[in-house]
Structure formats: structure tokens, C-alpha cells
Design a protein with these regions (language model features):
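Short, basic interhelical loop/turn and adjoining N-cap
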Residues: 21, 27-45
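Short, basic alpha-helical nucleic acid-contact segments in DNA-binding proteins
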Residues: 45-53
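Beta-strand-turn-beta hairpins that frame and shape the catalytic cleft
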Residues: 53-60, 180-186
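Core catalytic region of metal-dependent phosphoesterases/phosphodiesterases
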Residues: 57, 62, 67-170
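Acidic carboxylate-rich catalytic motifs and surrounding loops in phosphoryl-/glycosyl-chemistry enzymes
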Residues: 137-142, 176, 273-277
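Conserved beta-sheet core of the metallophosphoesterase superfamily
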Residues: 184-277
Length: 280
């Protein structure tokens, strides 16, 4: 196969500013044997290894909006933060939705049914997808509640719709599985890495800088160094509406939700940006 498509992809993406979907549509004739999703994965994988892609743009990372129980101003806070730091890429570290109605834990008496909750979640997500047409995301434990409940009665993943389709996410939103590595930073939801030291503990075990969500109460960055390198662990906080019934369980918790997001500059530098009072 000719490598001309690589030069064409770089030109379309960097020089003409085309979206991923537009780039892949233009390159479709170069990959007659691949379907659109496979083409996008191939092109994205190549582009993200290019020096031009890696050249300096910070990454905005958010997690845990738990739609439809997200804070009403959270997407606009993300928009302002991305603009302020000139973010060139956006990532979500899971729990896009809450799935309160289908939890194995008891639902609140006032809870909506599963379909009504899903419909509202899709409406809320459309705000995020309009503001950020292209996002790389991983799945969180709340996103996977559907699969776990199905598995509990012997229904495997082959019988289920993909989460991407269930949530009606656009082509520009790409699921990267449970975790992935980009530019020597590991991005994951953070299951089993809770508490205020969860992120740095994961970074020390993984031996590389890590970004996680999951633990709502401990947004922030910690660093660890030895004689060879420095790594960070960042918990990017959450975007939940603590007044929503889905979070009634935390009414008396000592540590309240830390609303905010992360900005990753490189594999040795990151900051946590708390959501300011103007958005609360």
C-alpha cells in the first residue's frame, strides 16, 4: 500500500484543519478493504504519532460528568478552560453517564426509570458533543453497569449494543477502551485507585505519569521523582451536580465532590483546574 495517504492526511488535518471525519472520508478510496471506523482508527493512530501533532498543544482532560446528573454549567466551564489553555485535544476518563436506574444498588424512591434517565443523559451529552466534536474517551464503572447487569443473568456483550451507539455519540468521539497511553501518559478511569493519593499511587505502580478520575473528592496533582525521572499522578476531579438524587448517598460524606478538570502539558507537567464560583 502506498504511503501517500499519510502526507495527504497530514495536509488535511494540519494545513486545512479538517475534522477527523472529513479526513477519513477523503482517504476512504485509499482503503477499500476497511470500513469507516477502521479507517478512522488507522488515520488517528498515525496522526497522533506525528511530530506536528505532538508539538506543544496542551490536553484538556475531564471525567465523571455522570449525565444526566452533571452540574448544569460543567460543559461551559470545560469550554472556557479549553480556550484559556489553548487545548489541542480533549479527553474524558469515563462515567459519561450514571445509569442510576440500573444499578445493582437500590435506586432512590424518586428515581426516573432507565429509559427516561437515558433520554435525559443523551440530551445532556449533546451539549458536550456540540462544544467538543472530537473527544477520546475511556469507559468507567458506571458506563459499564449495563454490561455487568446483563452478565449477571448470563447475557454476554455479543448481545448488547455498543455504548457509543446507546449514547448516540458522534463519530468524532472515539472510545479507547478501559485505558490507553499517549505520549508516555497513561489515561484510565481509575477503578481501584481511590483516595487522595490514588493517582500518584497508580503512577508509581505503572512507572509512568497517570491521569485518572473516579474518585470524586480528590482533584489535584502530585509528583514523584527518583534519580532517573519524574512522574505525576493527576485526579482530574468530576463534573457532578451534588444536589441530584443520584448522589444522595454522599449527603453526609466528609469529603465533598471536587469539580474541575486537568490540563496535561507533557509527561512531566500537569495542573488541576477547579471549577470557579462563577460557574457554581
Amino acid at each position: 500500500m502506498s504511503t501517500d495517504w499519510k502526507a495527504k492526511a497530514e495536509h488535511l488535518r494540519f494545513d486545512e484543519g479538517k475534522t477527523w471525519a472529513q479526513v477519513c472520508q477523503a482517504l476512504a478510496p485509499d482503503f477499500p478493504e476497511l470500513n469507516p471506523k477502521q479507517i478512522e482508527e488507522k488515520v488517528r493512530s498515525y496522526i497522533r504519532r506525528c511530530d506536528r501533532y505532538k508539538s506543544n498543544s496542551p490536553i484538556l482532560v475531564f471525567s465523571d460528568p455522570h449525565c444526566p446528573f452533571d452540574h448544569p454549567n460543567f460543559p461551559y466551564f470545560l469550554q472556557e478552560t479549553a480556550k484559556k489553555y489553548k487545548a489541542g485535544q480533549v479527553m474524558c476518563l469515563g462515567d459519561l453517564v450514571d445509569n442510576h436506574a440500573i444499578s445493582r444498588h437500590g435506586a432512590e424512591p424518586c428515581a426516573l426509570g432507565a429509559y427516561s434517565e437515558l433520554d435525559l443523559a443523551i440530551q445532556r451529552l449533546k451539549i458536550y458533543t456540540a462544544l467538543f466534536p472530537e473527544v477520546d474517551y475511556v469507559t468507567g464503572n458506571h458506563d459499564e453497569r449495563i454490561n455487568r447487569q446483563a452478565a449477571s443473568v448470563g447475557i454476554g456483550a455479543r448481545f448488547l449494543k455498543d455504548l457509543h451507539d446507546v449514547l448516540e455519540l458522534p463519530e468524532g468521539w472515539i472510545c479507547r477502551g478501559n485505558e490507553f497511553i499517549q505520549d508516555n501518559v497513561l489515561y484510565s478511569h481509575g477503578v481501584n485507585w481511590s483516595g487522595k493519593n490514588g493517582a500518584i499511587n497508580k503512577a508509581q505502580v505503572e512507572r509512568m505519569s497517570c491521569a485518572i478520575g473516579h474518585s470524586h473528592s480528590f482533584g489535584g496533582v502530585q509528583y514523584s521523582a527518583n534519580s532517573r525521572d519524574t512522574v505525576f499522578g493527576i485526579n482530574v476531579g468530576c463534573g457532578v451536580n451534588r444536589e441530584a438524587y443520584a448522589f444522595a448517598y454522599g449527603k453526609y460524606a466528609k469529603q465533598k465532590e471536587t469539580l474541575g478538570c486537568g490540563i496535561i502539558f507533557n509527561n512531566q507537567s500537569a495542573i488541576f483546574v477547579p471549577m470557579g464560583k462563577e460557574f457554581l
